[in-house]
Amino acid sequence: YQGQKCSAASRAYVPKTVWESMGNDLVAEVEKIKMGDASDFSNFMTAVIDGRAFDKIKGYIDRASNNPECKVITGGKCDNESGWFIEPTIILTENPNSETMVEEIFGPILTIYVYEDNAFEDALDLCDKASPYALTGSIFSSNEENIQKAYDKLRFTAGNFYINDKPTGAVVAQQPFGGARASGT
């Protein structure tokens, strides 16, 4: 779905030591994603929906590329010669309020903000206040106390909230759904 799904992950808050241990692996996995014609089933990803979406998503990548607080660490190439292809892109930002952390892109972009390990509760506040939108959200942790803190702080932040599962894991009508904010939840 090329990130064009309401439950696609578009932003992540990652503790520094976790990022140091998995950042390179994440980039390597994203770089393995094969993109091309939808009729070739060996492709995992294809074009975005139309030219308007292409222009909008490309604009986010271009602005991030020119922002000294952001760095495109993989992807970022856009090709509209035969379809509207945008590589899966990861942006690393130093600013938790940068454009791609607070706006809904609806495309193949993940922006990551790395926070100091001792700033978990501050990161939860950032998550809570980042955007008026959020159909889905996830927290990954092996620390039960942090899971509970995240649950308590973020339980009304998204319509679907996952613990140690991807945000696109929903099975319609198989879980409670509701919430607040401007996502139609």
PLM features: what roles do these ranges have?
Residues 1-96, 114-129, 163:
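ALDH superfamily catalytic-core signature
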Residues 34, 78, 85-185:
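Conserved C-terminal structural/oligomerization subdomain of aldehyde/semialdehyde dehydrogenase
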